[in-house]
């Protein structure tokens, strides 16, 4: 299958690569089908969550544990059932990154992680019910530190 995207031109993908968000993404509830775009071989922590339903929409995402190793939250039974999770080790965790003109002001939304069950490609974005994490968490310095210690 192929998709003509705004950011990447034509990309080829297989049906089994499609991640299904039953509820969409908050603010984009009408979008349900996405791809993760990013080269595993490259030493780049960022990936793209590319909408198939609207090829003009793509979100920059990152595994928050790359820059914040202590990032954790509870995955309750309701969430496990919703994603049909058999093994929590198969869950992928991403957060949406905003990269403004001034790169120093780059932030990640730690308050609303994206969780994907890699076993069945079901995904959801949840909003954490605590004050531990910010919607606009500055990440540039933490990324620099993570890569200087790698």
From Swiss-Prot:
Query: NCBIfam families recorded for this chain?
Result: PRK13285.1-1
Instruction: Describe, as the record does, how this protein assembles with itself and its partners.
Output: Interacts with translational regulator CsrA and flagellin(s).
Which PANTHER family would you find in this protein's record?
FLAGELLAR ASSEMBLY FACTOR FLIW
Source organism per UniProt? Caldanaerobacter subterraneus subsp. tengcongensis (strain DSM 15242 / JCM 11007 / NBRC 100824 / MB4)
Where is it located?
Cytoplasm
Q: Which domain of life is it from?
A: Bacteria
| Record-level GO cellular component terms | cytoplasm
Say what the protein does. Answer: Acts as an anti-CsrA protein, binds CsrA and prevents it from repressing translation of its target genes, one of which is flagellin. Binds to flagellin and participates in the assembly of the flagellum.
Q: Which lineage?
A: Bacteria, Bacillati, Bacillota, Clostridia, Thermoanaerobacterales
* Leader peptide range in chain numbering: none
Q: Which SUPFAM superfamilies match?
A: BH3618-like (SSF141457)
Q: Where do the coiled-coil regions begin and end? A: none
Keywords, A to Z, come to:
Bacterial flagellum biogenesis, Chaperone, Cytoplasm, Translation regulation
- InterPro entries the record matches: Flagellar_assembly_factor_FliW, Flagellar_assmbl_FliW_dom_sf
Q: Which cysteines are joined by disulfide bonds?
A: none
| Annotated protein name in UniProt | Flagellar assembly factor FliW
The record's annotation in Gene3D superfamilies points to:
BH3618-like
GO biological process annotations for this chain's record? bacterial-type flagellum assembly; regulation of translation
The UniProt family comment states: Belongs to the FliW family.
């Amino acid at each position: 299958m192929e998709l003509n995207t705004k950011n990447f031109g034509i990309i080829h993908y297989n049906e089994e690569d499609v991640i299904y968000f039953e509820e969409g993404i908050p603010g984009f509830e009408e979008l349900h089908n996405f791809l993760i775009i990013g080269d595993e071989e490259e030493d780049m922590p960022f990936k793209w969550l590319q909408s198939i339903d609207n090829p003009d929409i793509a979100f920059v995402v990152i595994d928050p544990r790359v820059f914040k190793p202590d990032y954790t939250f509870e995955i309750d039974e309701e969430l496990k059932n919703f994603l049909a999770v058999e093994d929590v080790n198969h869950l992928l965790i991403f957060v949406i990154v905003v990269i403004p003109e001034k790169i120093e002001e780059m932030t990640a939304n730690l308050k609303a992680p994206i969780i994907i069950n890699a076993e069945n490609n079901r995904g959801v974005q949840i909003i954490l019910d605590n004050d531990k994490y910010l919607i606009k968490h500055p990440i540039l310095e933490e990324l620099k530190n993570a890569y200087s210690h790698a």
